[in-house]
């Protein structure tokens, strides 16, 4: 059986919290920001949790997290 490896792209995008939930960054905050309102950009600042339907696939990409 081959060695299990962590997907490096996933390890840079996600963090496992102490409670076991997975933290992710918000999308739509990199460019084309002039047409977005200040309120919208402010709400995109924080982090969010990965949705429960995607948790299994994220955990499969990070077997040691």
Swiss-Prot record:
Q: Which UniProt keywords apply?
A: Ribonucleoprotein, Ribosomal protein
Keyword set includes tRNA-binding: no
Q: What family does the database annotate?
A: Belongs to the bacterial ribosomal protein bL35 family.
Designated gene of the protein:
rpmI
Its domain of life reads: Bacteria
* Keyword Ribonucleoprotein assigned: yes
Question: Which Pfam families does the entry link to?
Answer: Ribosomal_L35p
Q: What is this protein called?
A: Large ribosomal subunit protein bL35
Organism annotation: Bordetella petrii (strain ATCC BAA-461 / DSM 12804 / CCUG 43448)
SUPFAM superfamilies, from UniProt? Answer: L35p-like
NCBIfam families, per the entry: rpmI_bact (TIGR00001)
**Gene Ontology cellular component list:** cytosolic large ribosomal subunit
GO BP annotations, alphabetical order? translation
Output one GO MF annotation. Answer: structural constituent of ribosome
Q: Which HAMAP family match?
A: Ribosomal_bL35
Q: Which regions are flagged for Basic residues bias? A: 1-15
According to the UniProt record, where is the region Disordered? 1-27
